Amino acid sequence: LRRTGYMGTDEFMGVRPLGFHPVPGEWYRVKVEVCGNRIRIFLNDEKQPHIDLVDKNADLVPSGEVALGGGWIETEFDDLTVTPMADDALKNVKVAEYQKKATPTEKENKRRQERASYTSAKLAALTGSRTDITLDGNWLFMPDYQLDNKDKAVSVQTNDQDWHIMSVPNFWTPIRIWLHGETMPSPTGAQPKGVSDTYYQQETDRCENYTFDYRRVKYAWYRQWLELPANVEGKNMTLTFDAVSKIAEIYINGTLATSHLGMFGEIQVDGSRLLKPGKNLITVKVTRKMDGSASESANAIDFFYSSVRESEQEDAKVEVNKDALLKEIPHGFYGDEPAGIWQPVKLTITDPVKVEDVFIKPTLNGATFDVTLKNHGSKKKQFDLYTDIIDKETGAVLYSGLSIRKLNLNADEERMETYTISDLKPRLWTPQHPNLYDFKFRLVADKGTELDCLTETSGFRTFEVKDGLFYLNGNKYWLRGGNHIPFALAPNDENLANTFMQLMKAGNIDVTRTHTTPWNKRWMTAADRNGIGVSFEGTWSWLMIHSTPIPDQRLIEIWRNEFLGLLKKYRNHPSLLFWTVNNEMKFYDNDSNLERAKEKYRIISDVVKEMRRIDPTRPICFDSNYQATGK
């Protein structure tokens, strides 16, 4: 609803979902009631209006004529009638709008059907030396307002037939992020619709259709039953949660295995001593709000956007809102306190001697490898390390050979081995030819027994800065790209990732940045495959922007550790060209306090030193920015 007004007083009044898709060729009846400062919009024969609001500026437009027309599509209007209303016609009529919501009985029936169709995760047999089982899919779910008892929530004895079903990975809240979640003013208050009616309604409907009231949930319990075969006894079993927002407590068969604070960090849980053959229960408590705060996240995105263009003269305004802006964990541009197990979950089963981590440092004719190995067992173990490099497209073997002979690891010992393979002739990775290889790292014991085999997909390419210019594979380039792409709207939609990146390629865009929020494995893998170069940004946009105070040291540590963890997680992706610390920090010439600006520099400098230690192969950009004030 938009109301025209005198001398520039036109106003956007509100937007509401129809609840159905209009059909071309059909007629729809619309009734508009205007009585004093009240406006009500009815559709067809519904008894309640779709829009019912008070126009605070009605006195500016006390009278006028009626006109028909407008719209973006060809529309026919007919049978217009105008009927006078008494001045007090709506005096005793409460403001109430039509809402199409499921009744409690309908929701309970749906919950029972979904619960009846739930099946536990099951691994029938181990597959080779390393077995990965995805735990994505339906999990049991119980909000805090229905269960506020930890012992009952985590117990394997608890009857969970009355639990809800929640998909993983997913948020249990609607995604409200920057351009798709910003508020628009209206007489009834701010409306966080953003630029897309369709997306806003899609996310709202997703959460309204849950069998619980997502608005009431402060924290929730997730449960997943998992059946394992008999021969997992004595194996190393690692649970990996790519990301949980925002606080996670993970229990295995009733025992607390680990806890984690942060929205983007990977959580690895050694479940070797807690998981067993047969039936197991994984329980996760996910908390939406820190310390009971109900308003900080809700206000943060609005303040971010309103303050990001503020100049240093408005220092006081920024500091007044420091609690709403800074005293919460990094969440990118996400607003409205997103919560849930929102990135994939898997269980990895290996021998106690395993490859823990691999860092591939490519050149144009080979690579240097940092391979971290660990013996989780109770006895010393000897083995050989082999490396295979296989073209992912053709299956051709580029290299296969023994890399290190007779390695010895004592019980519970972890060690990193470094070696180089050279004189290869690989197909290089470029945006035009995104050639990828599977790098296999095999641990082989006596008599050829394979203890572990980790496969990492990567590519051969170099990216560096020399004399102020960028060089990809030794060739000089000007760097120009476009952003941002819709990762944050659908972080687990692989089809969207591939489709959008192909559209970018069709539009001659080969480079972008992970603006608004860091990407996950699905989108980074899509960038590798589609040939999209990436500037990977940090998790805290506008950190210490302008003249804002320095955040609490605990928050700085959360940001630092989480971001450095992402470097280790994604440093093998060839599409990742360089790291960017954050988006628009801009304190370097916009902080009115020079000593505070120097301290901010020291904080960032310490993090950058760690970034260079974790990944010495890539350039680092201070922040994503544009022309500085007055420069």
Describe these PLM feature segments.
Residues 47, 53, 72, 121, ...:
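Accessory beta-strand-rich segments of carbohydrate-active enzymes
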Residues 16-22, 66-67, 210-214, 224, ...:
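Beta-strand-rich interaction surfaces with strong enrichment in secreted/lumenal proteins
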Residues 174-228, 232-240, 245-252, 258, ...:
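Active-site-adjacent substrate/metal-binding segments within catalytic domains
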Residues 1-103:
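Extracellular glycan-recognition regions
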Residues 349-378:
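Surface beta-strand/loop "capping" patches
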Residues 273-279, 372-464:
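Extended acidic/polar, glycine-enriched regions
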Residues 1-5, 91-240, 320-343:
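Extended carbohydrate-recognition surfaces in non-catalytic/accessory domains of CAZymes
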Residues 591-631:
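Extracellular glycoside hydrolase catalytic/binding regions
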